[in-house]
């Protein structure tokens, strides 16, 4: 499975919503797809399943606003 697909699957799992895979440009926070509690869960899952550590200090809601932006940010960190 390619990295992008792994990230989108993980995001869909945390969000409990496949819209993140169907529309990777959806504004996940603005649309209420992911809340702050799920954000913490997402960061933990990224660390556990992708072995990429993202501290809450490195997390910027604007830079992580869409699934596509999350994939890009994680590609830079891996």
Curated annotation (Swiss-Prot):
Organism: Staphylococcus aureus (strain Mu3 / ATCC 700698)
Keywords of the record: Cell wall biogenesis/degradation, Cytoplasm, Phosphopantetheine, Phosphoprotein
Keyword NAD among UniProt keywords: no
Keyword Oxidoreductase: no
Protein purpose: Carrier protein involved in the D-alanylation of lipoteichoic acid (LTA). The loading of thioester-linked D-alanine onto DltC is catalyzed by D-alanine--D-alanyl carrier protein ligase DltA. The DltC-carried D-alanyl group is further transferred to cell membrane phosphatidylglycerol (PG) by forming an ester bond, probably catalyzed by DltD. D-alanylation of LTA plays an important role in modulating the properties of the cell wall in Gram-positive bacteria, influencing the net charge of the cell wall.
Pathway as given in its UniProt record: Cell wall biogenesis; lipoteichoic acid biosynthesis
NCBIfam families recorded: dltC (TIGR01688), PRK05087.1 (NF003464)
GO biological process terms held by the UniProt record: cell wall organization; lipoteichoic acid biosynthetic process; symbiont-mediated evasion of recognition by host antimicrobial peptide
PTMs per UniProt: 4'-phosphopantetheine is transferred from CoA to a specific serine of apo-DCP.
GO cellular component: cytoplasm
Broad class of the protein's primary localization: cytoplasm
Annotated InterPro entries: ACP-like_sf, DltC, PP-bd_ACP
Family matches, as Pfam families: PP-binding (PF00550)
Name this polypeptide is given: D-alanyl carrier protein
Family, similarity comment: Belongs to the DltC family.
Residues that bear O-(pantetheine 4'-phosphoryl)serine: 36
Transmembrane segments: none
Localization in the cell: Cytoplasm
Domain Carrier residues, every copy: 1-78
Domain of life of the native organism: Bacteria
A GO term for molecular function: D-alanyl carrier activity
């Amino acid at each position: 499975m390619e990295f992008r697909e792994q990230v989108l699957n993980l995001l869909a799992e945390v969000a409990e919503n496949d819209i993140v895979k169907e529309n990777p440009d959806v504004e996940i926070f603005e649309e209420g797809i992911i809340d702050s509690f799920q954000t913490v869960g997402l960061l933990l899952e990224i660390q556990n399943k992708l072995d990429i550590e993202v501290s809450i200090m490195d997390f910027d809601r604007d830079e992580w606003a869409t699934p596509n932006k999350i994939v890009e940010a994680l590609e830079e960190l891996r």
